[in-house]
């Protein structure tokens, strides 16, 4: 698994339809599903730093993306 930075994760969230709803100590990103369910994840402001692996996997679960889906979003032009 390649390492992913906070900046890259943020870009993938934007491409997946998430929107920034709050930015204080951490950024809060949300996406409302057609069922009305809201997915939410918080990101650190540490743009260029790599996301630690356990935290990365927890964040993927929160946004319901697989590693392959995230990498595909990052490869989009």
List the model feature ranges, each with a label:
Residues 1-77:
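Basic nucleic-acid-binding interfaces
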